[in-house]
C-alpha cells in the first residue's frame, strides 16, 4: 500500500487527490479543492500552503506528484501559478515527502492514452479508473489524474528495474 497525493496547483483553486496504490490497483481515498478567499496573492499562497499541509498531515502520503507549470500566454498568470505551485511544494517538503513532477501532456497520456486529451475526457477516465460514482470537480479530477500518472510511472519504472515484488502486487 502506498498513498500518493496528486496536486493540481492554481492561484484561486488548487485541486488535491489522495490515491491508495497496491500493485496496479488504485482507489481514491480523498479528493477536493482548496479555494482561496483573498484578492491579494500573499494571503492566497498562505491558504494553499495551509490546505496542502493539512492534507499531508491527515493522510501521510508516501509520495507527492504535482503538475509542472506550463508557459501561459499571460506572464502574470504564469507567475501566479508558479507561486501557487511553490506554496504547495513547500508544504509537502516541510513533511519531507518526495515530490515528482509531470507535465499536463504526460498526465493526459498516462490517464487517457493521448497527450492532447480534453479536460472532460480526463475527468471521465478518472471516474472510470477509480470506480467513482460521479466525475469529480475539475481541479480535483486533475489532481487525481496526476496521482494516477505517478502511480503508472512508479509501476513502470519498478518493472523496468526488475523489482521482484511487482508480480505479487507490491512495488519494492
UniProtKB/Swiss-Prot annotation:
Binds 2 Mg(2+) ion per subunit. Gene3D superfamilies: Ribonuclease H-like superfamily/Ribonuclease H (3.30.420.10). It catalyses: Endonucleolytic cleavage at a junction such as a reciprocal single-stranded crossover between two homologous DNA duplexes (Holliday junction). GO terms for molecular function: crossover junction DNA endonuclease activity; DNA binding; magnesium ion binding. Mg(2+) 2 binds at residue 67. Its cofactor is Mg(2+). Keywords: Cytoplasm, DNA damage, DNA recombination, DNA repair, DNA-binding, Endonuclease, Hydrolase, Magnesium, Metal-binding, Nuclease. Signal peptide: none annotated. SUPFAM superfamilies: Ribonuclease H-like. GO terms for biological process: DNA recombination; DNA repair. The RuvA-RuvB-RuvC complex processes Holliday junction (HJ) DNA during genetic recombination and DNA repair. Endonuclease that resolves HJ intermediates. Cleaves cruciform DNA by making single-stranded nicks across the HJ at symmetrical positions within the homologous arms, yielding a 5'-phosphate and a 3'-hydroxyl group; requires a central core of homology in the junction. The consensus cleavage sequence is 5'-(A/T)TT(C/G)-3'. Cleavage occurs on the 3'-side of the TT dinucleotide at the point of strand exchange. HAMAP family: RuvC. Homodimer which binds Holliday junction (HJ) DNA. The HJ becomes 2-fold symmetrical on binding to RuvC with unstacked arms; it has a different conformation from HJ DNA in complex with RuvA. In the full resolvosome a probable DNA-RuvA(4)-RuvB(12)-RuvC(2) complex forms which resolves the HJ. This is Crossover junction endodeoxyribonuclease RuvC. It comes from Alcanivorax borkumensis (strain ATCC 700651 / DSM 11573 / NCIMB 13689 / SK2). The gene is ruvC.
